[in-house]
């Protein structure tokens, strides 16, 4: 959950503690393996180099989907004027549903996290040509989303843009099989700050939010 502030020529309001989720895409070979469809599901891409036997540095892209839940009841503070809608008014922690006519807000064309990492690998078990290693790491980068937002009667922005930054930590497990193959799983968590979100085709319309 997070607070999201929306600001423009005729409005400045914050919706408080609103819920969002990612968007999972059902697995099909076409959606996940066809290069022309690669941006439909969420994905991670990473390339790196071992500077020491157990230390690597890498560059990656995390293509995520962020979708604000519709029809949830939110508290709103601020004002909206001259929109020509029923939402004009002054709000003071007022309960208001996030309906389609008011707001649709998604980074569903990509909440793209362009990041750099450093990782340490620690082998803790080797048996019968199988090696088990733990992975820990830290990273940082910038956010390059394409936001699909519909705010009141405004046309949406349809461009990629720089919106903020992220920092993260990770841990994982690597199982190396006969030197040439491996299976790896990871858990990554972090903090994202988005102070410059483009919401509509008008450059004066912006939003900001932070979340873990």
Region spans (language model):
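Flexible, solvent-exposed coil segments and beta strand-coil junctions
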Residues: 20-28, 91-100, 146-154, 197-201
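Predominantly the C-terminal beta-signal and adjacent terminal strand-loop region
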Residues: 4-5, 11-14, 19-21, 172, ...
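Outer-membrane beta-barrel translocator domains and adjoining extracellular loop/strand segments
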Residues: 3-9, 70-76, 145-155, 196-203
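Gram-negative (and chloroplast) outer-membrane scaffold detector with strong preference
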Residues: 46-150
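Residues that define the transmembrane beta-barrel architecture of outer-membrane proteins
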Residues: 39-43, 108-114, 132, 161-167, ...
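Extracellular loop and loop/strand-boundary signature of outer-membrane beta-barrel proteins
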Residues: 30-33, 100-106, 151-160, 200-210
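Membrane-embedded beta-strands of outer-membrane beta-barrel proteins
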Residues: 45, 116-118, 167-171, 187
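Short glycine/proline- and aromatic-enriched beta-strand/turn motifs that initiate or cap beta-hairpins
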Residues: 1-50
